[in-house]
């Protein structure tokens, strides 16, 4: 069994810094997705987990929480990507509470 783990994604879905308006290949879930796919091909018996701090930290997080809040029945962009990558489980981080509770 191989454990694959991510943490502190903070809505960094793309390798792009929206505050500096510039590409930044040092972060982004898209970058991790490539590594996840490679690891899954090499180790087929695996679990993909996340340690939390998903929804706060970028302009996208602020937009989906404050400007145009996502309803409880809808899915945040980061969760759509995680569903696409087929995460097996995740935990709640402290930043999941930055915007309060619905």
Tell what function each PLM region has.
Residues 1-102:
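N-terminal catalytic scaffold of extracellular/periplasmic and nuclease hydrolases
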């Amino acid at each position: 069994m191989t454990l694959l783990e991510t943490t502190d994604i903070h809505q960094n879905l793309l390798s792009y810094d929206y505050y500096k308006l510039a590409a930044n290949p040092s972060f982004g879930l898209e970058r991790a997705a490539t590594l996840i796919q490679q690891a899954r091909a090499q180790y087929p018996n695996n679990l993909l987990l996340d340690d939390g701090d998903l929804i706060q930290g970028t302009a996208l997080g602020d937009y989906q929480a404050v400007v145009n809040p996502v309803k409880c029945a809808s899915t945040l962009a980061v969760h759509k990507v995680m569903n696409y990558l087929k995460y097996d489980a995740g935990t709640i981080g402290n930043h999941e509470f930055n915007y309060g509770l619905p």
